[in-house]
UniProtKB/Swiss-Prot annotation:
Organism: Dehalococcoides mccartyi (strain ATCC BAA-2100 / JCM 16839 / KCTC 5957 / BAV1)
SUPFAM superfamilies cross-referenced by the UniProt entry: DTD-like (SSF69500)
CDD domains, per the entry: Dtyr_deacylase
Protein name: D-aminoacyl-tRNA deacylase
HAMAP family named in the record: Deacylase_Dtd
Record flagged with keyword RNA-binding: yes
Length: 153
């Protein structure tokens, strides 16, 4: 499972011209589910993102998390994060989870975030969406749940 996490001053998502999710200051999370991902991957990323210290304290240091500040989160499914571009010029999405499996884990991720007290707005799984993201900083971090299996050097 991969996530692109962006600190935002505000963000919104529209489907067919209608706003279906919007937040003020917080995090916009683009979430991609890969074949073989499990609830453990969702648990890892939910905890990591909610507690990631990428908000500045009074001294300007990254010491505060979304949870510390009770900020909001916008979560949008994005299977294109699982693209394999190693061969040729057209991305392959063969490693992306099947839609039913991906939708289930996407919803597990959202539920876990909400259970931690985070206000979560969402896009619509599988829909064509228009995102408006006001990146604050900019601060953008890429996370992969499989990284937890690799020891840090």
């Amino acid at each position: 499972m991969k996530a692109v996490v962006q600190r935002v001053s505000r963000a919104s998502v529209r489907v067919s011209g209608e706003t279906v999710g919007e937040i003020g200051p917080g995090l916009a999370v683009l979430l991609g589910v890969a074949e073989g991902d499990t609830e453990e991957d969702a648990e890892y990323l939910a905890s990591k993102i909610i507690n990631l210290r990428i908000f500045s304290d009074a001294e300007g240091k990254f010491n505060l998390s979304l949870k510390d500040l009770c900020r909001e989160m916008l979560v949008v499914s994005q299977f294109t994060l699982i693209a394999d571009t190693r061969k040729g010029r057209r991305p392959s999405f063969i490693e992306a989870a099947q839609p039913q499996e991906a939708d289930g884990l996407y919803n597990v991720f959202i539920r876990l975030c909400r259970e931690e007290g985070t206000q979560v707005a969402t896009g619509q799984f599988g829909a064509m969406m228009m995102l408006e993201i006001y990146n604050d900083g900019p601060v953008t971090i890429i996370l992969d749940s499989r990284d937890r299996l690799n020891p840090r050097l």
